[in-house]
């Protein structure tokens, strides 16, 4: 096989690897109780180590009412980053009862800067960047979900 064909085949296989390696996620619904009323979201659940490592990496878009919930099982000092994440995100850090204890707005795509919770958190919810400001979500708001039961 000529060298050019080998290179094209290699490039194709290399491009396809992330698609093979991508995790699949379960889904649930959640509601954020804000001062202006309930805000509903359809979320994907990142529950395993592999799912949490992948998160929203490589996604080029996400519906406005969608997000991802990370469950760390017990309250811990949570650190996140945006490596290989194409879209800007808002992050909500929650305690075990679903109360928002910290918010990080508009995390920068592809950044490897560490985003840490100020307090130990059990859950992190990632939403499209700008959602927190648009809906008035803030520290102290309560999040409910069938997943929490």
Residue map of PLM features:
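Compact, glycine-rich, soluble single-domain proteins
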Residues: 22-149
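Bacterial N-terminal signal peptides that target proteins for export
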Residues: 1-8
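Bacterial N-terminal signal peptides
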Residues: 8-18
């Amino acid at each position: 096989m000529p060298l050019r064909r080998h290179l094209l085949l290699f490039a194709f296989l290399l491009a396809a690897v992330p698609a093979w390696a991508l995790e699949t996620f379960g889904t649930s619904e959640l509601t954020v109780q804000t001062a202006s009323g309930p805000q509903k979201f359809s979320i994907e659940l990142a529950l395993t180590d592999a799912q949490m490592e992948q998160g929203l990496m490589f996604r080029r878009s996400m519906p406005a009412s969608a997000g991802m919930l990370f469950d760390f099982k017990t309250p811990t000092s949570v650190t996140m980053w945006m490596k290989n994440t194409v879209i800007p995100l808002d992050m909500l850090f929650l305690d075990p009862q679903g109360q928002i204890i910290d918010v990080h707005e508009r995390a920068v795509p592809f950044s490897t800067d560490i985003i840490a919770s100020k307090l130990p958190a059990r859950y992190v919810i990632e939403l499209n960047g700008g959602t927190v400001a648009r809906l008035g979500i803030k520290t102290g708001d309560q999040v409910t979900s069938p997943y929490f039961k």
